[in-house]
């Protein structure tokens, strides 16, 4: 099994990163370089999380071998060396090789490749690709130029920070500047920035994740929160449609002014390709190909303005598409949660859906997840399961907070992570060591990464599932992962006292900490910032528990879901009404489709039989008629059939209620024939101003 576990985890982590990227990204529409860059960043970060437990178990085995080699057989105590505590005699307690043992020399090379590749991605390549993807240039040269200009300040800041550390080391008379020390300074600067952000995200996730499961077990909580999301998403959806309309109006004007032989026509064609298909069909070229442009009597947009318009179109189309998909997903969630609320009082213990799933389910899932099992899970088991899971996660959070505040204490050892690992180290239970390390670092990663997936920065950074994340957000997430994962793992090794700078023992370090270098070059960071700054997680957890951040966002006008707030109640009621209208609309559509299906099944076959009999009894002499008469007869029958079909459609038209008004407007803004595209009419009442009328 030597090295086999490492190879299996490398393959498994690759497919895990590929699966998550497929869920959030769009392989068909997004650029290949964006997909490859994001996949590589996620893959390297996940590798660090999954491979680090193997490094810990291998290091413990190497420490045992080193202690056994330095111990004399007749004596029962070890020489002052790797272990400060007494070790048993090797003949009585031999060092067992772990099942996942990695041969010497592999892990240092592996960590160097993974770490420095991830650092190159996060500090150099991904920021450049981010600016390149957001650029509205029409050529590769133009996009590269824009990306370099945008990143000039970005890279200048890094050079300034690195220069400050460099001056500190150069001025200090007790330090001699060498290449290893320069490397350590760079690693310390990157880890310091990452640890600063890590504690902020960790303090939020340690409280919010257990609380989300506890609140999810409450009856009606998820449904109320879904109503709240529906009201906010409708406002965002209307805003996205208005922005798209404004962008398409500008494109229409540019398309009409710049003719086929204008030098900038290729730029306009590039912009048109980025527009939705329905807008392209509506506008077309919208010009006369035989009409030349006149430079003297017309005012044409510049290339710089077209670049700005191109960037605006890309952003507007992506945001509009994302809100449309999210709205449909939110509707399905709301309908399902309403079904759960209705089925809770069911006496038959059979889960009944209001609407059938549009996608056919797997037969295997249908067999086991039948209506009876679904009722017991959704109405009885799931709330209890969520409560138990919330309690377990809360215990993990308390352990993390306690260990973050006490991991610097070595005598006695107060960090619970260090206590558990040292107990397993005495018996060389490598399976337990790897499982404990993996669960601990996995929980820390979930708390940090889930916060990264949840945060949203003014629509510029937003990870949306169902392939709705844009290139800018994907690359930004890759940058965050590469910056957060190394300090996260270094912090975990400090919690378990596997880092010699924390345990203050002359023991063999892990291969991961060996590539970080000695932090004694920057003692104020190693002995100060790395130890005392993580204690701030206590303050952040308290602030998150009392929802101080949520209340501040509410005061600033960014509405958040709070049960004791009047604005939240108004938005919940508004969202409930929106869901009710959409539900009634879908019910009418399904009823209309059912009536059409019944009409075809009842009268479709009779009409085909009568037509077939009429053709059989037709006079054979009619076949000698001229082609003109044949065409005329066919035209008459076509008109008759069309008239009958129109009558049938009119009979099948759904009768709308008397109070029906908003649903008569169409979702497609292209049906307006005016020169200016009309904004979505039914969303005007849902504008952002209506939300704050009662304030």
UniProtKB/Swiss-Prot annotation:
Cytoplasmic-side positions:
22-32, 127-150, 208-387, 454-473, 543-695
* Membrane topology classification: Multi-pass membrane protein
The modified positions for Phosphoserine read: 633
Give TM regions: 6-21, 33-53, 106-126, 151-171, 187-207, 388-408, 433-453, 474-494, 522-542
**Keywords annotated in UniProt:** Cell membrane, Coiled coil, Disease variant, Glycoprotein, Intellectual disability, Membrane, Phosphoprotein, Transmembrane, Transmembrane helix
Task: Decide whether keyword Membrane is in the record.
Answer: yes
Where are the stretches annotated Disordered? Answer: 581-628, 662-682
- Taking the record's annotation, the residue ranges forming a coiled coil are 227-262, 571-603
Q: Which GO annotations describe the biological process of this protein? A: adrenergic receptor signaling pathway
Outcome of swapping residue 479 to R: In DENBA; uncertain significance
Q: Where is the composition biased (Basic and acidic residues)?
A: 588-624
Show the Pfam families listed in the entry.
LMBR1
- Extracellular compartment spans: 1-5, 54-105, 172-186, 409-432, 495-521
Subcellular compartments = Cell membrane
Q: Which GO terms describe its cellular component?
A: membrane; plasma membrane
Q: Which residues are glycosylated?
A: 78
The record, for InterPro entries, names: GPCR-associated_LMBR1 (IPR051584), LMBR1-like_membr_prot (IPR006876)
The UniProt similarity line reads: Belongs to the LIMR family.
Function, please?
A: Recruited to ligand-activated beta-2 adrenergic receptor/ADRB2, it negatively regulates the adrenergic receptor signaling pathway. May also regulate other G-protein coupled receptors including type-1 angiotensin II receptor/AGTR1.
Record: disease = Developmental delay with variable neurologic and brain abnormalities: An autosomal dominant disorder characterized by onset of motor and speech delay in early childhood. Disease severity and clinical manifestations are highly variable. Most patients have delayed walking and variably impaired intellectual development. Additional features may include seizures, spasticity, and ocular abnormalities. Brain imaging often shows thin corpus callosum and may show white matter atrophy, myelination abnormalities, or enlarged ventricles.
Annotated protein name in UniProt: G-protein coupled receptor-associated protein LMBRD2
Per the UniProt record, the source organism is Homo sapiens (Human)
């Amino acid at each position: 099994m030597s090295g086999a576990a490492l190879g299996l985890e490398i393959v498994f982590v690759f497919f895990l990163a590929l699966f998550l990227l497929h869920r959030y990204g769009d392989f068909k529409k997004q650029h290949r370089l964006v997909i490859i860059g994001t996949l590589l960043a996620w893959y390297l970060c996940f590798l660090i999380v999954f491979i680090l437990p193997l490094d810990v178990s291998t290091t413990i085995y190497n420490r045992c071998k080193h202690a056994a080699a330095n111990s004399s057989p007749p004596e029962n105590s070890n020489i002052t060396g790797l272990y400060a505590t007494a070790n048993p005699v090797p003949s009585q307690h031999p060092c067992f090789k772990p099942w996942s043992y990695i041969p010497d020399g592999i892990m240092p090379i592996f960590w160097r490749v993974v770490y420095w590749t991830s650092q190159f991605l996060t500090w150099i390549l991904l920021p450049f690709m981010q600016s390149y993807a957001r650029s509205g240039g029409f050529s590769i040269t133009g996009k590269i130029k824009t990306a370099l200009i945008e990143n000039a300040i970005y890279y200048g800041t890094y050079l300034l920070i690195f220069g400050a550390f460099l001056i500190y080391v150069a001025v200090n008379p007790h330090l001699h500047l060498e290449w290893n020390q320069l490397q350590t300074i760079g690693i310390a600067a990157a880890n310091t920035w990452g640890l600063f952000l890590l504690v902020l995200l960790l303090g939020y996730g340690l409280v919010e994740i257990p609380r989300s499961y506890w609140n999810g077990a409450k009856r009606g909580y998820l449904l109320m929160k879904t109503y709240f999301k529906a009201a906010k998403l409708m406002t965002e959806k209307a805003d996205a449609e208005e922005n798209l309309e404004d962008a398409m109006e500008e494109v229409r004007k540019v398309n009409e002014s710049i003719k086929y032989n204008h030098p900038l026509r290729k730029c306009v064609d590039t912009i048109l390709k980025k527009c939705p298909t329905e807008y392209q069909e509506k506008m077309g070229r919208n010009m006369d190909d035989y009409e030349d442009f006149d430079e003297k009597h017309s005012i044409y947009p510049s290339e710089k303005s077209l670049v700005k318009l191109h960037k605006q179109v890309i952003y507007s189309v992506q945001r509009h598409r994302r809100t449309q998909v999210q709205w449909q997903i939110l509707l399905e969630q709301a309908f399902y949660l309403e079904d759960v609320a209705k089925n809770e009082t069911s006496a038959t213990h059979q889960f009944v859906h209001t609407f059938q799933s549009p996608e056919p389910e797997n037969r295997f899932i249908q067999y086991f997840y039948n209506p009876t099992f679904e009722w017991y899970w959704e109405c009885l088991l799931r709330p209890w399961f969520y409560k138990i899971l919330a309690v377990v996660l809360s215990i993990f959070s308390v352990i993390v907070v306690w260990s973050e505040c006490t991991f610097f204490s070595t005598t006695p050892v107060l960090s619970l992570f260090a206590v558990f690992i040292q107990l397993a180290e005495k018996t060389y239970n490598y399976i337990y060591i790897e499982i404990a390390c993996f669960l601990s670092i996995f929980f820390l990663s979930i708390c940090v990464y889930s916060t990264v997936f949840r945060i949203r920065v003014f629509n510029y950074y937003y990870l949306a599932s169902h392939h709705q994340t844009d290139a800018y957000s994907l690359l930004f997430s890759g940058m965050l992962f590469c910056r957060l994962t190394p300090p996260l793992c270094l912090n975990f090794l400090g919690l378990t006292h596997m880092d010699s700078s924390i345990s203050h023992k002359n023991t063999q370090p892990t291969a991961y900490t060996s590539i970080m270098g000695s932090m004694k070059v920057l003692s104020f960071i190693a002995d100060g910032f790395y130890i005392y700054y993580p204690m701030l997680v206590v303050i952040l957890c308290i602030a998150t528990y009392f929802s101080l951040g949520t209340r501040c966002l509410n005061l600033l006008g960014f509405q958040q879901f709070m049960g004791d707030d009047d604005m939240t109640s108004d938005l919940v009621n508004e969202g409930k009404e929106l869901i009710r209208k959409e539900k009634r609309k879908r019910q009418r559509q399904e009823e209309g489709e059912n009536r059409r299906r019944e009409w075809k099944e009842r009268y479709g076959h009779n009409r085909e039989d009568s037509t077939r009999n009429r053709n059989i009894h037709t006079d054979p002499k009619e076949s000698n008629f001229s082609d003109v008469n044949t065409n005329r007869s066919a035209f008459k029958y076509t008109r008759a059939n069309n008239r009958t079909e129109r009558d049938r459609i009119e009979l099948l038209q759904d009768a709308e209620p008397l109070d029906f008004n908003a649903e008569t407007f169409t979702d497609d803004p292209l049906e307006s024939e005016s020169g200016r595209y009309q904004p979505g009419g039914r969303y005007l009442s849902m504008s952002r101003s209506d939300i704050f009328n009662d304030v």
